[in-house]
């Protein structure tokens, strides 16, 4: 019995289909082996400790190739400075700085909507719009001074440092504009403070110092100023609502890092992760619990 063209085409088609199925099956087995190999290699690089979030990967490791600015909590200006140090602000030689502080206080900005927790109604309220510009200039520095000097000695300090990824560091004008937008104002001890009001009135919530010694800022030469790192710090006991104040401090540090190409670090000079921030909040809760127990 002769095989016709139709039968030959059927046989050839079956062979081709079988070959395609076999090739697909072979590729599938090979792909599974490669995928498993990649997964095994990636998981072998994950550190054992917590904090392996996206924040610890990528460009943050670039800083390990050069020496970071050294910062200890002892380098930060004391929140309970002596009266002699506070008098420096009122010397005639600081007249130009006071003028710049007054100009900074006049910058009109809206409050940042930063806190994830409900805010106290009067915690971050704006200053009275009925204040005249002259009164603002004359009262801004005394208000800042009185609120800082009245703080008790800090028993615990929460520190968030922002280290520049650029070799040139943070430039003075850009740094000044950024922190003014976050509501910080230049004041006592030649550093910046964040008060209840964006205009610089009310109690001090937290402060920002130069992380490079001597730890201060020179507004007279701010156009030529630069620094490799700055440190935000909040002392306990301190503001009446420390958890809300801490949230504002975190937002200000993140804003600076995002806009000026910086990297967030904790008080141990490790990358600031979500777990670290939560640990800071827990320290605040524990401090408030201890303070309440002592009052009893």
Swiss-Prot record:
Keyword Cell membrane part of the UniProt annotation: yes
Residue ranges, annotated region (Disordered): 66-148
Compositionally biased region (Acidic residues): 123-132
Subcellular location: Cell inner membrane
InterPro entries for the chain: Cell_div_ZipA, ZipA_FtsZ-bd_C, ZipA_FtsZ-bd_C_sf
Annotated Gene Ontology cellular component terms: cell division site; plasma membrane
SMART domains on file: ZipA_C
Residue ranges of the TM segments: 2-22
Highest taxon of source: Bacteria
Topological region Periplasmic: 1
Membrane topology: Single-pass type I membrane protein
SUPFAM superfamilies in UniProt: Cell-division protein ZipA, C-terminal domain
Residues in the Cytoplasmic compartment per record: 23-296
Bias kind Polar residues: ranges: 135-148
Ranges of compositional bias, category Basic and acidic residues: 83-92
GO BP term, example: FtsZ-dependent cytokinesis
Family: Belongs to the ZipA family.
Subunit composition and interactions: Interacts with FtsZ via their C-terminal domains.
Cited function: Essential cell division protein that stabilizes the FtsZ protofilaments by cross-linking them and that serves as a cytoplasmic membrane anchor for the Z ring. Also required for the recruitment to the septal ring of downstream cell division proteins.
Protein name according to UniProt: Cell division protein ZipA
Species annotation: Pseudomonas putida (strain GB-1)
């Amino acid at each position: 019995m002769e095989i016709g063209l139709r039968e030959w085409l059927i046989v050839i088609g079956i062979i081709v289909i079988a070959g395609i199925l076999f090739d697909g099956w072979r590729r599938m087995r090979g792909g599974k082996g490669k995928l498993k190999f990649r997964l095994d290699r990636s998981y072998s690089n994950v550190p054992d400790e917590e904090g392996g979030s996206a924040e610890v990967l990528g460009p943050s490791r670039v800083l390990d190739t050069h020496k970071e600015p050294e910062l200890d909590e002892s380098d930060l200006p004391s929140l309970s400075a002596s009266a002699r140090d506070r008098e420096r602000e009122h010397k005639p030689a600081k007249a130009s700085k006071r003028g710049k502080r007054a100009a900074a206080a006049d910058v009109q900005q809206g409050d940042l909507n930063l806190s994830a927790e409900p805010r106290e109604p009067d915690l971050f309220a704006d200053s009275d719009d009925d204040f005249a510009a002259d009164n603002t200039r004359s009262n801004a520095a005394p208000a800042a001074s009185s609120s800082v000097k009245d703080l008790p000695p800090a028993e615990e300090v929460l520190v968030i440092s922002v280290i520049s990824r650029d070799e040139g560091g943070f430039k003075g004008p850009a740094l000044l504009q950024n922190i003014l937008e976050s509501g910080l104002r230049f004041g006592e001890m030649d550093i910046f403070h964040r008060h209840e009001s964006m205009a610089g009135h009310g109690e001090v919530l937290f402060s920002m110092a130069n992380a490079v010694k001597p730890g201060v800022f020179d507004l007279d030469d701010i156009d030529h100023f630069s620094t490799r790192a700055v440190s935000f710090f909040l002392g306990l006991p301190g503001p009446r609502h420390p958890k809300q104040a801490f949230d504002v401090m975190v937002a200000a540090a993140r804003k600076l890092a995002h806009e000026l190409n910086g990297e967030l670090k904790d008080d141990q000079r490790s990358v600031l992760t979500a777990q670290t921030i939560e640990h800071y909040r827990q320290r605040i809760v524990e401090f408030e619990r201890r303070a309440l127990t002592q009052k009893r």
